[in-house]
């Protein structure tokens, strides 16, 4: 769980980012804070630095990762402010988590390559191919606003969680990635970076969160959550009142 909002000053639950981290066990950091995006508050370097300082100290005091999830827009300044902070201060790069780095054009994707090489972490939007703004491979679940030619918002929807699996299928079946490498993008990488306890690996005494895929086309066969079977090829477990909602 993250506290915060697109704009700075961010919205918090207790009135303070540090207090949210210390007092609320589920809060791991802040975000998404929008940068270089038409929905952001166009924060200054000092405002971003103050937020990073707060999340670092709050993370240290609470024993949490303390990360800020930055929603990246398509402005020509890209991630220049974050590079400046990284080069001019002692804030570690691990506290800056960049998202949408794959769907804002090839220049931002090149920045992602440099950021990862410097030891940073990015994530990529597993969009449908027609929604990508770059020629790179289909790049996880996100909101999908639609605008007209004048920039007016005409629709706001959400992409399906299954797009994460589709991205993995494409990497393996279309681009010949080894399966054990492709699945890391959605499983072990985020679990390790965000320090999710007992998650991300098939290890004794870890939560038994498992999906079973068809060996040929990687289609979903079984879903197991914390050791409980949730889906088989012929059956899906429903919530106790879910059948009631179908009639509303």
Regions found by a protein language model. Name each.
Residues 39-40, 47, 52-147, 154:
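Active-site core of metal-dependent hydrolases
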Residues 14-18, 137-140, 227-230:
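Short low-complexity, flexible loop/linker segments enriched in glycine and/or proline
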Residues 3-4, 155-248:
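Active-site microenvironment of metallo-dependent hydrolases
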Residues 7-10, 131-132, 188:
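Short secondary-structure capping/turn micro-motifs that flank functional sites
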Residues 1-47:
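Divalent-metal coordination cores built from histidine and acidic residues
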Residues 2-5, 30-35, 72-73, 100-101, ...:
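Fold-independent oxyanion-binding glycine-rich loops
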Residues 24-28, 62-65, 93-94, 118, ...:
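Short coil/turn connectors at secondary-structure junctions
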Residues 1-7, 12, 138, 143-168:
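Short intrinsically disordered, low-complexity coil segments enriched in acidic
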């Amino acid at each position: 769980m993250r506290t915060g909002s697109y704009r700075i000053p961010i919205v918090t639950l207790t009135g303070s980012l540090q207090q949210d981290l210390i007092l609320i066990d589920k809060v791991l950091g802040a975000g998404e804070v929008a940068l270089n995006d038409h929905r952001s508050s166009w924060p200054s370097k000092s405002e971003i630095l103050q937020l990073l300082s707060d999340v670092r100290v709050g993370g240290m005091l609470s024993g949490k990762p303390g990360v800020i999830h930055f929603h990246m827009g398509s402005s020509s300044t890209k991630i220049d402010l974050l590079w400046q902070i990284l080069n001019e201060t002692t804030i570690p790069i691990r506290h800056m988590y960049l998202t949408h780095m794959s769907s804002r054009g090839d220049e931002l994707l090149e920045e992602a390559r440099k950021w990862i090489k410097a030891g940073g972490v990015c994530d990529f939007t597993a969009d449908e191919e027609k929604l990508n703004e770059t020629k790179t491979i289909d790049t996880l679940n996100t909101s999908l606003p639609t605008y007209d030619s004048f920039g007016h918002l005409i629709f706001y929807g959400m992409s399906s969680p299954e797009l994460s699996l589709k991205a993995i299928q494409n990497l393996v079946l279309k681009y010949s990635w080894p399966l054990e490498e492709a699945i890391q993008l959605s499983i072990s990488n985020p679990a390790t970076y965000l320090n999710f306890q007992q998650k991300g690996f098939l290890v004794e005494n870890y939560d038994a969160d498992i999906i079973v895929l068809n060996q040929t086309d990687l289609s979903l066969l079984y879903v197991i959550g914390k050791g409980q079977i949730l889906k088989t090829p012929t059956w899906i477990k429903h919530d106790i009142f879910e059948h009631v909602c179908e009639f509303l």
